[in-house]
UniProtKB/Swiss-Prot annotation:
The Q motif is unique to and characteristic of the DEAD box family of RNA helicases and controls ATP binding and hydrolysis. Residues 460-632 form the Helicase C-terminal domain. It comes from the Eukaryota. Residues 97-111 have a biased composition (Basic and acidic residues). Residues 1-37 form a transit peptide. ATP binds at residues 207-214. It is an enzyme of class 3 (hydrolase). This is ATP-dependent RNA helicase mrh4, mitochondrial. A motif (Q motif) lies at residues 141-174. Residues 194-406 form the Helicase ATP-binding domain.
C-alpha cells in the first residue's frame, strides 16, 4: 500500500519472459548438484591411472631370456662362431611386402608366349633335338671334311665365297652336305611302280635366314651332276664301241641292206637338276650363284623367268650343248613342259627353294604337277625353307612321311645380333601419324655416325651410304610411303609387284651387293683428292641457292617394299629394317627381320606400333629375341 492507502502493482522487470525461462533452465537446482557429486565418486578411473593386478605376479615362461645385445667389444676374443641354429622365419605379411612369397612368384612367372600361342603358325622343334644336332655338328670345322670332288671343293673359296678371309661351313652346311652326299647314288636306276608312293630320297633343309642354305644344297647337286657326267661318258664310250662292232658285222654280212641309223637323243632342253624358286628376283640371285661355280667346275647352267624375253628363254633351254642345272619359277616351267614333253625326262635332282611358299595354295598345284612328271627319273627331292609352317608340316607328314628333316639348332629364332626397337606412334610428336614417325626414325638413323670401323684409312674415303628397308603390308601403300619420304628430303624408292622388271633389277642391285673393301690405290687417290679439295684459309665457300627443299638427308637410301623382298633376297648391304606395319604372323616377322644379321653381321630393326596394333605380340617377339628362343 502506498501512502494514500491504495494497493500498488509490482513493477515489471526489464527482462522478457523468454530470457527468464532460459536462465532458470541453465542454473541447476540444489538436488541436481548433490546427485551429480555422489555419482562422480562411483565412476571408474581411467586405465592409465590404475595399475594392473598382475604386476607382482611372476612370468609364466621361465625359460624365456631377455635378448642380449652385443656391445661394441663383444666380437673380441671369440673362440667359436655364434651362429643361430635355425634362421629366423619371416611372417607372411613381411613376405608379401617384399614380394618374395611363392604366390607372388607364381603370378610373376607367366609363360613367355601367351599371345603368340593364340595364333600359332609354326611347327615346333623339340629343344632336345636341337641340342643333339648342335653336338653332332661341332666337330666339322672345314669344307675339306666333306667328300666332295676336288674341283668342287677348290671352287668354294674362289667362286662361291670370294673375298672372305676365313671360310668355314655354317651349321646347315655341316648338317646337310654330308647327308646329301652320303645318300647320293648317281647310277641308281628308276623304279617303275604303279603305286603313288615316292621311290626317291626326300630331304627337308630348315635353317634360319641368312645361314647359307643355297650353298648347302648347291654343292651336293653340282657334285652329283659331275659324277653323273663322268658315268655317262663311260657308258657312251662303251655304247660307241658296241655300235662300231655291230656296224662292221652288218657291213660284212649285208653290205647293201644297211638301215639308216636314228640320230641320238640330244641333251638340249633336258636338264639334270632343276631349282624352283617362287619369284623372278630369286631366280636372278640363285642363278648368279650357280653360274659362278660353273666357271671352274665346268657345267652348263641357265635361268628362266618372266623378266626374260621368249627368244632368250628358248636359247637357254634348247642350247645345242645341252643344259645341266636350270633355275626357274614353277608356272613358267610347267607351261613350257606342256609343249616339250622331254623337258623333264632326265631330271635326277629337284630342289624347292622357299618350300613354304612353293607348297602353299597359290603354288601347290603347279609344284605338285612338276614333281609327278619328274618322278620316274628323280633320285632326290630337296625342300629348303627358313620356316616350317604348320600347314607345310601337315602336308609333309601326309605326302612324304619318310622325309629326312635336317634342322639347325636356331630354327625359327631371330639372331640375337639383331636388335629390335619399338616406336609408339600415338605419343607426341607423331600423334598417330605413322609416315611421320617413319621419316623421323630414318632421319635419326641417317644422321647418326657409322658404328662399324672400316679401317685406319676410313677417314680419307667417302662416308658409306646407309641402306634401309621399310616393309609395308599392302602393295598400294608402298608408293604412298615412298612419296611422303621423298617430300621429307629422303632418297626413297618403292618396290612391289607392280614395278617394272628393269626397275626391280636396278634397285635390288644397290641393296643386295655389299661394297668391297677399298684397295690401296683407292685409298691413295682419296688422300690426293682430300688435299686438293681442302679450302683456302679465311675464305668462305660460296653458297648456291637451289630451288626446292634444301633439307636433304645425305648418304642414306631407303627402299619401301612388300613381302616381295622378304623371301630369300640376300640383302648383305642392309643394316636397318623398319616395319611400317606390325606383321600379321610370326612367319612374316622372321622373314622381314631375316634381312638383317646375315652371315654373322649385326642389324637393327624398328617396328612402328599404333593404337590398333597387337602390342602384346610385339612384346613377346622382342622378349624371345632377347632370350634367343625360337618363335612359335
Amino acid at each position: 500500500m502506498n501512502r494514500l492507502g491504495r494497493m500498488s502493482l509490482p513493477l515489471r522487470s526489464p527482462a522478457c519472459l523468454i530470457c527468464q525461462t532460459r536462465t532458470t533452465t541453465l542454473i541447476p537446482s540444489s538436488w541436481q548438484t548433490a546427485r551429480s557429486m555422489a555419482t562422480a565418486r562411483l565412476r571408474r578411473k581411467v586405465s592409465r591411472m590404475a595399475l594392473s593386478p598382475d604386476v607382482a605376479k611372476p612370468s609364466l615362461n621361465k625359460d624365456r631370456k631377455k635378448r642380449e645385445r652385443p656391445g661394441p667389444f663383444a666380437a673380441m676374443n671369440q673362440t667359436e662362431a655364434r651362429i643361430r641354429d635355425t634362421p629366423r622365419t619371416r611372417s607372411q605379411a613381411a613376405l608379401k611386402r617384399s614380394g618374395d612369397s611363392k604366390e607372388e612368384a607364381q603370378k610373376k612367372e607367366s609363360p613367355l608366349y601367351k599371345a603368340l600361342k593364340m595364333q600359332t603358325t609354326l611347327a615346333p622343334v623339340p629343344y632336345g633335338k636341337r641340342t643333339a644336332v648342335k653336338a653332332k655338328i661341332a666337330d666339322i670345322t672345314s669344307f675339306d671334311q666333306f667328300p666332295l670332288l676336288p674341283v668342287v671343293r677348290n671352287s668354294i673359296v674362289s667362286q662361291a665365297l670370294p673375298g672372305l678371309m676365313e671360310v668355314t661351313p655354317t651349321p646347315i652346311q655341316r648338317l646337310a652336305i654330308p647327308k646329301l652326299l652320303e645318300e647320293s647314288k648317281p647310277d641308281k636306276k628308276p623304279v617303275k611302280t604303279d603305286d603313288d608312293e615316292p621311290h626317291y630320297d626326300q630331304f627337308l633343309l630348315a635353317a634360319e635366314t641368312g645361314s647359307g642354305k643355297t650353298l648347302a644344297y648347291l654343292l651336293p647337286v653340282v657334285d652329283a651332276v659331275k659324277r653323273a657326267e663322268a658315268v655317262d661318258k663311260e657308258l657312251e664310250k662303251k655304247e660307241e664301241e658296241e655300235k662300231a662292232r655291230e656296224r662292221e658285222e652288218k657291213m660284212k654280212n649285208k653290205a647293201f641292206d644297211i638301215e639308216p641309223e636314228l640320230p641320238p637323243l640330244s641333251n638340249a632342253g633336258r636338264p639334270r637338276a632343276i631349282i624352283l624358286v617362287p619369284t623372278s628376283e630369286l631366280v636372278a640371285q640363285v642363278g648368279v650363284k650357280v653360274k659362278a661355280l660353273s666357271h671352274t667346275v665346268k657345267y652348263r647352267s641357265g635361268m628362266i623367268s618372266s623378266n626374260l624375253t621368249p627368244r632368250r628363254i628358248k636359247n637357254t633351254l634348247f642350247h645345242p650343248d645341252g643344259i645341266d642345272i636350270l633355275v626357274a619359277t614353277p608356272h613358267l616351267l610347267a607351261s613350257i613342259a606342256k609343249t616339250e614333253p622331254y623337258l623333264l625326262s632326265r631330271v635326277s635332282h629337284l630342289v624347292l627353294d622357299e618350300a613354304d611358299s612353293l607348297l602353299d595354295r597359290s603354288f601347290a598345284p603347279t609344284t605338285t604337277e612338276i614333281i609327278s612328271k619328274v618322278a620316274p627319273s628323280l633320285q632326290k627331292l630337296i625342300l629348303c625353307s627358313a620356316t616350317i609352317p604348320r600347314s607345310l608340316d601337315n602336308l609333309l607328314r601326309k605326302r612324304y612321311p619318310d622325309i629326312k628333316r635336317l634342322t639347325t639348332p636356331n630354327l625359327h629364332a631371330i639372331p640375337r645380333r639383331v636388335q629390335l626397337g619399338v616406336v609408339d606412334i600415338e605419343k607426341d610428336p607423331y600423334r598417330g601419324n605413322r609416315s611421320l614417325a617413319c621419316a623421323d626414325v630414318i632421319w635419326s638413323i641417317g644422321k647418326a655416325g657409322d658404328s662399324e670401323v672400316s679401317g685406319p684409312y676410313s677417314s680419307f674415303l667417302e662416308p658409306k651410304t646407309k641402306k634401309i628397308l621399310v616393309f609395308v603390308n599392302e602393295r598400294e601403300e608402298a608408293d604412298e610411303v615412298a612419296q611422303f619420304l621423298q617430300s621429307k628430303g629422303i632418297d626413297a624408292h618403292s618396290l612391289s609387284r607392280d614395278s617394272s622388271a628393269r626397275k626391280q633389277e636396278e634397285i635390288l642391285a644397290e641393296f643386295t651387293e655389299a661394297p668391297p673393301p677399298p684397295s690401296p690405290d683407292e685409298i691413295m687417290l682419296a688422300q690426293k683428292q682430300r688435299r686438293h679439295e681442302d679450302p683456302i684459309p679465311f675464305e668462305m665457300p660460296k653458297r648456291t641457292n637451289s630451288g626446292g627443299s634444301t633439307r636433304r638427308l645425305p648418304n642414306t637410301k631407303v627402299l619401301v617394299t612388300t613381302d616381295l623382298t622378304s623371301r630369300g633376297i640376300d640383302t648383305l648391304a642392309v643394316k636397318t629394317v623398319i616395319l611400317y606395319h606390325v606383321p600379321h604372323t610370326t612367319i612374316d616377322f622372321i622373314h622381314r627381320l631375316g634381312r638383317l644379321g646375315r652371315m654373322g653381321k649385326r642389324g637393327r630393326g624398328v617396328v612402328l606400333v599404333g593404337k590398333k596394333d597387337r602390342k602384346d605380340v610385339v612384346k613377346e617377339v622382342r622378349e624371345g629375341m632377347f632370350r634367343g628362343q625360337a618363335l612359335i
